[in-house]
Amino acid sequence: HISAEIMQLHHSKHHAAYVNNVNVVEEKLAEALGKGDVNTQVSLQPAFRFNGGGHINHSIFWRNLSPSGGGQPCGDLLKAIENDFGSVDKLREKLVAAAVGVQGSGWAWLGFNKESKRLQIATCANQDPLQGTTGLFPLLGIDV
């Protein structure tokens, strides 16, 4: 269970700041592109990655939530979990261990590897987006 206060803080403060900041960076980037200012374009990349990643990650995070919980996985997802992890409980153990292992700020993810057609657990530092850093398609994210 995550309190309403924490969710409000995440939505109205954290996520909103990422969206506002990525919009500012996009404006500066467009200006630098128009001027052919490569130095500024390069210098904006860390802020673009951090704030853009924060927006991407939190957008996925909100889609993962439900006021009454999501229940147990079923269908193809359950089959994939059992095939790749043995059981839902084993997946949960590994995902929690990955989240606990994140040093500082970051994310623990359940992602889908399109090449191997398998589920994988991965972590990303700070607000680095899963797909952009690992190539995995994000299914479930835990903000650490």
Swiss-Prot record:
Binds 1 Mn(2+) ion per subunit. This is Superoxide dismutase [Mn], mitochondrial. Mn(2+) binds at residues 10, 58, 143. The keyword Oxidoreductase applies. Pfam families: Sod_Fe_C (PF02777), Sod_Fe_N (PF00081). One of its GO terms (molecular function) is superoxide dismutase activity. Homotetramer. Keywords: Manganese, Metal-binding, Mitochondrion, Oxidoreductase. It is found in: Mitochondrion matrix. Its main location: mitochondrion. Destroys superoxide anion radicals which are normally produced within the cells and which are toxic to biological systems. It comes from the Eukaryota. Its cofactor is Mn(2+). Its EC number is 1.15.1.1. It catalyses: 2 superoxide + 2 H(+) = H2O2 + O2. Belongs to the iron/manganese superoxide dismutase family. One of its GO terms (cellular component) is mitochondrial matrix.
